[in-house]
């Protein structure tokens, strides 16, 4: 193993350990991590980064699914939303990609407000997204089983 390979592995191990902190003690993350790590054979953070570098090209649409609505208040959760927006910005800055956030309709307003904070312009029309710089899309999905086939 070269010094660069060792450094990459150690950075990945540290990032994976950080992302597997489980302050609530659910244990689910560690179970899912173990299976995923066995599948990839390397730190998941570095594996994901390499897959993105290999796959994402300029102007590619990259779909990011996020968000759920907290009941009974009907407000969107925000930790996944914020993380998704930061990923969207990183994809634009690193690759010139065109991220599209796919979320429940109740989360669209939060996504739109976060877009401005991360310096991106947001549109529902993906044709517009593909023609403008620093832009991203948002696509709401229905929670209605009856409406889902039409969407």
Residues of each region from the PLM?
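Positively charged, low-complexity intrinsically disordered leader regions
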Residues: 1-61
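Short, glycine-rich nucleotide/cofactor-binding loops
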Residues: 36-42, 61-62, 66-83
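Short, charged beta->alpha transition segments
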Residues: 45-55, 87, 113, 140-145
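A general structural motif
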Residues: 59-61, 96, 149-150
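Acidic, glycine-rich active-site loops and adjacent beta-strand->loop/helix elements
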Residues: 68-70, 105-109
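Histidine-anchored nucleotide/phosphate-binding helix
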Residues: 77-96
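Short internal beta-strands
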Residues: 98-106
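An acidic, phosphate/nucleotide-engaging active-site surface
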Residues: 111-151
């Amino acid at each position: 193993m070269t010094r660069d390979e060792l450094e990459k592995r150690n950075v990945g191990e540290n990032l994976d350990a950080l992302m597997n902190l489980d302050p609530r003690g659910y244990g689910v993350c560690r179970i899912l991590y173990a299976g995923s790590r066995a599948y990839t054979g390397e730190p998941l953070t570095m594996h994901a980064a390499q897959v993105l570098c290999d796959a994402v090209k300029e102007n590619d649409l990259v779909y990011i699914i996020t968000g759920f609505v907290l009941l009974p208040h009907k407000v969107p959760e925000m930790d996944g939303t914020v993380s998704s927006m930061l990923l969207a910005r990183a994809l634009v800055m690193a690759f010139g990609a065109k991220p599209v956030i796919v979320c429940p309709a109740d989360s669209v307003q939060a996504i739109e407000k976060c877009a401005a904070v991360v310096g991106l312009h947001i549109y529902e029309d993906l044709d517009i997204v593909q023609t403008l710089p620093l832009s991203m899309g948002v696509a709401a999905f229905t929670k209605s089983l009856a409406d889902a086939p039409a969407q």
